[in-house]
Amino acid sequence: MVEQIMIQGTASDAGKSILVAGLCRLFKNKGKRVVPFKSQNMSLNSFITATGDEMGRAQVFQAEAAGVFPDVRMNPVLLKPTNDRQSQVVFMGSILDNMDAVTYHDFKQTLISKIQAVYQSLADENDIIVLEGAGSPAEINLNDRDIVNMGMAKMVDAPVVLVADIDKGGVFASIYGTIMLLNEEESARIKGVIINKFRGDVALLQPGIDMIEELTKVPVIGVIPYANLKLEEEDSVSLSGKNYVPNSSALLDIAIICLPRISNFTDFHVLEIQPDISLRYIRNLAEFGNPDLVIIPGSKNTLEDMAFLEKSGLKKAIQHYAEKAGKVIGICGGYQMLGKKMLDPNQVESEQIEISGLGLLDTETIFLNQKRTTQITGVTLSGEPVEGYEIHMGQTKRGESTSPFCEIKAVNGNQETHQDGAVSTNKNIIGTYIHGIFDNDIFLGNLFNELLTLKNKTVYPHEIIQLKEHKEQEYDKLAALLEENIQMDQLEKIMKGEKICVSTQKPVIKE
């Protein structure tokens, strides 16, 4: 029979996704068949599986940590906000519809039996499932129809461990408040607490641990120290802490436009881990500076984000930068914005029908009702092998003054040839639909060398850090960190349904 543990949090960005990934790697290293599971994920960071199904990025990196291929069953429901009122609802990798919150709140009850069936299919194939909740289980206005926190735990009778982030302050209030807001049945499911992102001497924390255990009757089974692990961050909350000031000692300054509806910012994780590269996210004109490369990322609402560029003054700044031979790369929605105009006659993304783009590429985009979700392999026109994935509802037509960026050779593992993207005559403006383009080390190394040449500097002096190898190392570090700082014997008892005693829990943080 499958063993299971559910990680819920006191708030968003408490560390649930990372903790699930670490536990998946830890159990994998013990020889267990383990998979992650999140019934419903709200995110603009998504991935396309080998079968062309769309799922949340968090469950992808958790699957990588578990040593298994991403499977859409690990994230059956994906909600992709299109604006402040609506989300695109994706079930088992395919779009169902756009729904507002009230409509979806009623609709999701129809998904319960389907989610249970999906979960059972994973349970039949694995030894352990590590479940992840969303936000906080104490969203009491939504709990009557919850399918992702205590509602999910109840569906499969999973024990829960609550994780709380001490780095933001108020950790004991958040633990106590969360547990006290739950009804008796729900709070009884919480079998342990983990305090995350701790800095300092745990001896100073111990009196608080003793008090919270006495108040809640729930043991604290771990205190995880703050660790500077370089892992993907899925939650958009994490973007608020991203740097916008260039590092003057770095060889290259790369600026990413932080769009209000930015999607798939995980595309840029590989840039963050490269030595001598300053990567920053800019939100307004004052932060623009004089970068060596500007990247316009993907967007879940391209027309509204284009309007943001206009209103903020960033449109003119990017155009002026390009006129002075600056290098600009647009990914997916960013590619669409580089063109002359975008048309949305069916109002797929926005209430706007048409909007002018940056005009840096001779292209036009029309939005269609059908979404393209594919994994691809190909070769750039410069001869670099690339692979990645596409997620878009726009169809872009190139004009005569542009060249294609890439020749696609295979789609979802099947031979298929077509052209992707567009490149300006002077080669300084590049647009592509390929997410994960920077994960290709040959392409990335050549890009760095090109940018350094434009600055009259020598070639990039470092070997490109390959993302896959880097991730494997970080997953192992994460697993070791958890094993050292969580009372694993107590966690395993919880997973087996055994009762653990509050009075015996004395977590000791390891340096």
From Swiss-Prot:
Transmembrane segments: none annotated. GO terms for molecular function: ABC-type vitamin B12 transporter activity; catalytic activity. The keyword GTP-binding does not apply. The active site is at C332 (nucleophile), H435. Pathway: Cofactor biosynthesis; adenosylcobalamin biosynthesis. Residues 251-443 form the GATase cobBQ-type domain. It comes from the Bacteria. The keyword DNA repair does not apply. Disulfide bonds: none annotated. GO terms for biological process: cobalamin biosynthetic process. NCBIfam families: cobQ (TIGR00313), PRK00784.1 (NF001989). Catalyzes amidations at positions B, D, E, and G on adenosylcobyrinic A,C-diamide. NH(2) groups are provided by glutamine, and one molecule of ATP is hydrogenolyzed for each amidation. Belongs to the CobB/CobQ family. CobQ subfamily. This is Cobyric acid synthase. It comes from Listeria welshimeri serovar 6b (strain ATCC 35897 / DSM 20650 / CCUG 15529 / CIP 8149 / NCTC 11857 / SLCC 5334 / V8).
